[in-house]
Amino acid sequence: MPDNTIRSNSEVVLIGAGIMSATLGLILKELQPDIKIEIYERLDVAAAESSDAWNNAGTGHSAFCELNYTPEKADGSIDPKKAISIAESFEISRQFWSYLVQQNKVPSPENFIKSVPHMSFVWGDKNVEYLRKRFEALQSNPIFADMTFSTDFNQLKEWMPLVMEGREADEKLAATHMEIGTDVNFGALTRSMFNYLEKLDGVTLYFNHEVKKLKQREDKSWRIKITDLSTGQKRKAYTKFVFIGAGGGSLPLLEKADVPEGHGYGGFPVSGQWLKCTNPEVIAKHQAKVYGKASVGAPPMSVPHIDTRVIDGEKALLFGPFAGFSTRFLKNGSYLDLPLSIKANNLIPMLSAGFHNIPLTKYLIEQVRQSPKDRMKALREYLPTARSKDWKLEKAGQRVQVIKKGKDGGGVLEFGTEVINTHDGTLAVLLGASPGASTAVAIMVDLISRCFTNQIKTPEWEAKMKEMIPSYGKTLNDKPELLAEMRKHTAEVLKIK
């Protein structure tokens, strides 16, 4: 029987056509224009899973409003480290996106980014005191210097009139406000990046192609077996470097690669839903992303927020997310994803993480059992005058939280974004969820420094990095003048505040 398998060779294979692969592919192509890249996506369109506008909050995560990035320590003080790191990362994204706009590599910035103030909002004496401490801990840093805090009823009304409707002036309320917050349509941005990328010489983008097997060969290169889902055609791709950026599908692919660095990793899927406003009059009254405090045991991705969104030119209003449990790793995945991901090398970490996260399990069970009335009750904590007839339930994206082996051999549930790479730098994979897309550029720059260690040190690559990201190699929070210069430049190019 003849072997009809198609064979191809490239220097880089990217698995998954989301924001991460788009970012990595574009940066590599800028650094080395003759590099040969193949991209494989199992769906028929780019950015249809985690990167799609309706599947994520669209918050330009800068830690301006997300309280889970500023935990309260045992002594009552606030640790700002993670918030500063995320804010720095988003500034890097702004610089790279500005470069793409200036070079006409992506069309008008209005298609993917808009100015929307970022706010944190709390009620009750204890939470008001926490927010005040958080404000003091952050505002002393140049990167958060523009933040304002208020407990004044009229000021809060001015910032978020819809949220304040139906409230009494003597309620214990507080909010912080950052005028320079953004709403980002990562789906539109990703598709624009791929539209540019696939027109370049040496880049091929394959839709409806699913990766079935990955195997490292003796010469350290990789053989990848792929099936064209529309025709059944088999393909073998040979490459020097593989990046797995397949969202919830990354963990099963990492397991197929069978590298020591991937042993002990597991995944815990968390699904999401939004309440979406259907009344244009209500939508028009709100112009902010207002984040609250997560309930006890809730995963950080489930911090409730009432969000102004601008999707495909249309203003929208969402509240959520409401978490749920599904054994799928992708919205378009299989119910067998979770059971099939359990292997001998991650069974103990998976069981241990489950045992140590009883509050999370309890929280998810409660969320799954919620009735429409329960969801409206949650919404009315933020919008006291909300009417059921103005809101409908929409399905959001699927997230897979990382479970990794702890020092004691047990499992630790991680709530961030994690990059794993092999010691030889030939394979890298991105696992996890928030802050994800917002920090894609910083994550991919770090990945390149780990996996392309010799090239990144060359004067040519370093100069190009500085052209794409002017603050490359520097931190901004300790350089107020450079920070102000970068913000002014990127705001002008991206047409934001």
Curated annotation (Swiss-Prot):
Swiss-Prot/TrEMBL GO biological process terms: tricarboxylic acid cycle
Gene3D superfamilies: D-Amino Acid Oxidase, subunit A, domain 2, FAD/NAD(P)-binding domain
Catalytic activity annotation: (S)-malate + a quinone = a quinol + oxaloacetate
EC number: 1.1.5.4
Requisite cofactors: FAD
Similarity annotation: Belongs to the MQO family.
PANTHER family the record matches: L-2-HYDROXYGLUTARATE DEHYDROGENASE, MITOCHONDRIAL
NCBIfam families: mal_quin_oxido, PRK05257.1-1, PRK05257.1-3, PRK05257.1-4, PRK05257.2-1, PRK05257.2-4, PRK05257.2-5, PRK05257.3-2
Protein name, per record: Probable malate:quinone oxidoreductase
Organism: Flavobacterium johnsoniae (strain ATCC 17061 / DSM 2064 / JCM 8514 / BCRC 14874 / CCUG 350202 / NBRC 14942 / NCIMB 11054 / UW101)
